[in-house]
Amino acid sequence: MMSTTLFKDFTFEAAHRLPHVPEGHKCGRLHGHSFMVRLEITGEVDPHTGWIIDFAELKAAFKPTYERLDHHYLNDIPGLENPTSEVLAKWIWDQVKPVVPLLSAVMVKETCTAGCIYRGE
């Protein structure tokens, strides 16, 4: 068998503010991002299908989470009252892992140059 990691990227638009930053910090003001989320799946490649998971299945599994995030104010979503990249990555993990057991990492990028990766506890 061959253990492999695959990934699928998603983008969504959302607004947020960080309530616990020092007064005057730019992230304390309402602002938005074009977020990028990468879901990584690690497992054995099925010898019959030649894949770990169908990309369409992964997309369908992420859709309910995507719809909760896209064009929303993240601070209003339960669990995202302090929506840092770190908190958002773990929150996405908690939504997706129950339906995609082979999920091995969630990457969240707020900008082209900044983000984080959550790999579970």
From Swiss-Prot:
GO biological process, one term: queuosine biosynthetic process
Reaction it catalyzes: 7,8-dihydroneopterin 3'-triphosphate + H2O = 6-carboxy-5,6,7,8-tetrahydropterin + triphosphate + acetaldehyde + 2 H(+)
Keyword Ligase attached: no
Cofactor note: Binds 1 zinc ion per subunit.
E.C. designation(s): 4.1.2.50
InterPro entries: 6-PTP_synth/QueD, 6-PTP_synth/QueD_sf
Residues at the active site: 27, 71, 110
Pfam families (alphabetical): PTPS
Requisite cofactors: Zn(2+)
Residues involved in Zn(2+) binding: 16, 31, 33
SUPFAM superfamilies: Tetrahydrobiopterin biosynthesis enzymes-like
Pathway: Purine metabolism; 7-cyano-7-deazaguanine biosynthesis
Keywords, sorted A to Z: Lyase, Metal-binding, Queuosine biosynthesis, Zinc
GO MF: 6-carboxytetrahydropterin synthase activity; identical protein binding; zinc ion binding
Metal-binding as UniProt keyword: yes
Known function: Catalyzes the conversion of 7,8-dihydroneopterin triphosphate (H2NTP) to 6-carboxy-5,6,7,8-tetrahydropterin (CPH4) and acetaldehyde. Can also convert 6-pyruvoyltetrahydropterin (PPH4) and sepiapterin to CPH4; these 2 compounds are probably intermediates in the reaction from H2NTP.
Additional free-text comment from the UniProt record: The active site is at the interface between 2 subunits. The proton acceptor Cys is on one subunit, and the charge relay system is on the other subunit.
Family statement: Belongs to the PTPS family. QueD subfamily.
Name of this chain's protein: 6-carboxy-5,6,7,8-tetrahydropterin synthase
Organism encoding this protein: Escherichia coli (strain K12)
